[in-house]
Amino acid sequence: MAIERKFVNDGFVKASMDEYFAEQLNRAGYGGMELNRTPMGTQIVIYSEKPGMVIGKAGKVIRKLTRDVAARYNLENPQIDAQEVKKPELNAQMMASRLAASIERGWYFRKAGHNTLRAVMNAGALGCEVVISGKLTGARSRVEKFVDGYIKHSGNPVDEVVDEGFAVAIKKLGTLGCKVRIIQPGVVLPDSYTTTEPSEPVTEPVEKPAEKPAAKPAEKPVEAPKKESAAKPKTPAVAPEKPVETAEVAEPEEAEEEPQAEVAEDLEEAEVIQVEGSEELRRQVNGVWQHKHEGYDYWHPMARVHKEAKE
C-alpha cells in the first residue's frame, strides 16, 4: 500500500498545485504547468500568455510563488520557470479561461462557445470540443456541446494527444463549467493512414549487344594472267544436218561445222567475190569457202546442202 499511497499523493500535489497557480496567475493568462522531480530539486515550468506578469517586478511574484509552494507541499529546493505560449488558441487551459471570462461578462453561451471553437480550428487544430454545463437558460442545468474536426474519446490516445482545459464561470443563477478539448496539429493518430498513387513503371531501355564487325575474307593471291597463245580460237562444233534425199544427189555430203565466232582480223582480211550473173557473194575464211545468196542472206559454208522447199 505504501507505493499506491505515494502515487496518489504525487497526483494530489500536482492537481492542487495546478489549481493554486490558476488562481494566482489568472490575469497573466495561465496555460498549465509541468512538474519534474530531480535529485537536484523539483523543477516547475509554468506556461503563460504573459510571462512578465508571472515573474513580476525584479522577480517579486516568482519568489513569492516559490516560497508558497515549498511551504504548502513540503518540496525541497523548488525551482520555477516561466515560458511564453506562442499560440494561445492551441492551449486548452487558456481557451477555457477565455470562455469562462466571456460568459461572466454577459456573452450568450452559444455565441461564446462558437467563437471559441472557430478560433481553435482557425489556428490549425485537427479537432476541438467545447462543453458548457450548468444553468444556462433556466432553472434546470443542462449541457451544450460544440464539436468540430476529429476528437478521440477513449483509449490511450486520449491521454497522449488530447489537450484538456477546464475553467469555472460564476453567474447569478449559479456556476457554469467550461471544458475545452483540443487535438494539436501534426499529431499522428493510431487510425490515420495515407494512400499513395502507384508510380508508373520505369522501363529501362534494352541495350542491344554490340555487333561484331564481320570478318573480312582472306584475300587470295592474285595470279598473273596467262599470256594467250597465238593460236586462233577453235570454233564450236555444229551438229550436221541430215541430207535431203533427192533423185539428183546420189550421196549426201557431210556438212562442215559452222563457225559462230570468228576473229575480227580474219574477217577484215577476207576478200568478198561476187559471182557474175547472180547475186551470190563468196569469200574464203581459214581455208573454207563461204557464200550467201538469195534466201540465205548470211555467210555459210558452200558445202552445206540446202533443203528444198516442198511444193
Curated annotation (Swiss-Prot):
Keywords, sorted A to Z: Ribonucleoprotein, Ribosomal protein, RNA-binding, rRNA-binding
A GO molecular-function descriptor: structural constituent of ribosome
Region spans: Disordered: 190-267
UniProt-listed CDD domains: KH-II_30S_S3_arch (cd02411)
Pfam families (UniProt xref): KH_2, Ribosomal_S3_C
Keyword Transcription among UniProt keywords: no
Domain KH type-2: 17-86
GO biological process, one term: translation
GO cellular component term of the entry, any: cytosolic small ribosomal subunit
InterPro entries registered for this protein in UniProt: KH_dom, KH_dom-like_a/b, KH_dom_type_2, KH_sf_prok-type, Ribosomal_S3_C_sf, Ribosomal_uS3_arc, Ribosomal_uS3_C, Ribosomal_uS3_euk/arc
Residue stretches of biased makeup (Low complexity): 194-204, 232-247
Keyword Ribonucleoprotein: yes
Compositionally biased region (Basic and acidic residues): 205-231
Signal peptide feature range: none
Compositional bias per record (Acidic residues), positions renumbered to this chain: 248-267
Function: Binds the lower part of the 30S subunit head.
HAMAP family: Ribosomal_uS3_A
Subunit structure, interactors included: Part of the 30S ribosomal subunit.
Family: Belongs to the universal ribosomal protein uS3 family.
Protein's name according to its UniProt entry: Small ribosomal subunit protein uS3
